[in-house]
Design a protein with these regions (language model features):
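Short aromatic-glycine-(Arg/Gly/Cys) micro-motifs in beta-strand/loop hairpins
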Residues: 2-25
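Charge-dense, low-complexity polyampholytic segments
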Residues: 22, 48-54
């Protein structure tokens, strides 16, 4: 995972929700809820913030 402190981006593109952890590391999800849950888990463990771009 990238350095602690960098925000985690959640955004929608081509009908998929993407979680961008930084440094090219991303995940795809079918719903905003799934993407938020994944991002929140990492953010809490690494003391990072989540930015949701709707």
């Amino acid at each position: 995972m990238p350095e602690s402190g960098l925000p985690i981006r959640v955004y929608k593109e081509n009908d998929m929700w993407h979680v961008d952890y930084g440094e090219g590391e991303t995940e795809e999800h079918t719903s905003l809820e799934e993407a938020e849950s994944a991002a929140d888990a990492v953010a809490q463990a690494e003391e990072r913030t989540v930015v949701i771009e709707e």
